[in-house]
Amino acid sequence: MYRFSNTVIGVLNLLTLLASIPIIGTALYKARSSTTCENFLQTPLLVIGFIILIVSLAGFIGACFNVAWALWVYLVVMIFLIATLMGLTLFGLVVTSQGGGVEVPGRIYKEYRLGDYHPWLRERVRDPEYWNSIRSCILSSKTCTKIESWTTLDYFQRDMTSVQSGCCKPPTACTYEAGVVDGGGDCFRWNNGVEMLCYECDACKAGVLEEIRLDWRKLSVVNILVLVLLIAVYAAGCCAFHNTRHAAHPYHPSDDNRMTRVRPRWDYYWWRWWHEKKEQLY
């Protein structure tokens, strides 16, 4: 049992150690490829990836080399990691439960409304300093350049990303006739300038939040899978820690201060039975 549980914890920690590498790689990739340069998802992902890497390494060393203190540190950190990841996952599910696009009659793409999203997300994109950094990133990614050459027919037949729908065109309800603007606040914010467009529109902020919402939903699924794995590893770690201490102190005093003998392992009886049978045959 001692060797079995320590082997299991060693293998599981090796798997989580290897799994932390793509987690870190995914966070770095999304930080570079994200249209909005949104980093409040990538930062927790990076931190979690590095913590899993370090904790798994400590658990692997403790289980394979019978280092009791390494396993003790591993178990303490692991329980905090599980609690943190569980809290982050629940928070993500709550703040992404609201939102989604609105169908536009006669169009394939959807449009997005800022009021449909969770208040925590809305307050975040309304912060001027924070929004300016996202706006600069959208400009540098040339997201709107990709639809500059679209014809009127393209707007009826082709789909858009949430950022393109909110930031690169005025809302479909807007009308601009004879110098009169009608259709709501975003219609007045629209500007034909390449660096202006609808970047200050609420629809643009909503489009960014929709991209974040979808990314966070995917991250929550990954977090749940990682949580299941970490809980399994933690349970095996508790067994390995118990066995490591038992290996260091194989005999324990009883209440009357007498030493009790440890019973032979179950596989010893099978080995003796097989050895006797083999001697009878030969």
Swiss-Prot record:
Residues 1-7, 66-74, 242-282 are cytoplasmic. The chain crosses the membrane at residues 8-28, 45-65, 75-95, 221-241. It is found in: Membrane. GO terms for cellular component: membrane. GO terms for biological process: auxin-activated signaling pathway; organ growth. Its main location: membrane. It comes from Arabidopsis thaliana (Mouse-ear cress). It holds the Pfam family Tetraspanin. Belongs to the tetraspanin (TM4SF) family. Coiled coil: none annotated. This is Tetraspanin-6.
